Amino acid sequence: ADNSPYIVAGSGHGGYDSIIMGPTDRIIENGDVLIIDTGTVYDGYFCDFDRNFAFGKVDDDTRHAHEAVFNSTDAGFAAAIPGATTTDVWKAMWDVLEAGGALSNDVGRMGHGLGMQLTEWPSNTADDHTVLEPGVVLTLEPGMTFAPGRQMVHEENIVITENGPEWLSRRAPAEM
């Protein structure tokens, strides 16, 4: 990597209420979850990924929410084939989140284009019908509010090839 221009984090008991928050005096405790959103630049191109870390034992709701965003990422990956749209990718991810107990997706989109800028067109949303073609680089970033004030978000990077999607980021473990 040439540099790592950003690192943002958030934490809270059993989830977090924002993935981008400033520092606090709060001490991490058993049952807390820390999210780190970071990336690097290599030869002018960005990567962007989120990782979740559990401190001690988390409750079942938190574990299930993490499982839902992880599985939602897999669903988005499977849907991201040439000729599909970013709406198809969003829908595949949202269906898994909704089945997993999502109350909402407060961000609205579940990933974005990636390249010489950190956030590029297109966006994985319900109303962005961009057709995926080989060479398109996307983040898959499903996020869900699963209880009041508790979110879970996951993010990976993919590229669309003639044969389907390929992971660009090293896949996070299935368990926090």
Q: Which residues fall in each region the model found?
A:
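Active-site neighborhoods and metal-handling regions in enzymes and metal-associated proteins
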Residues: 1-176
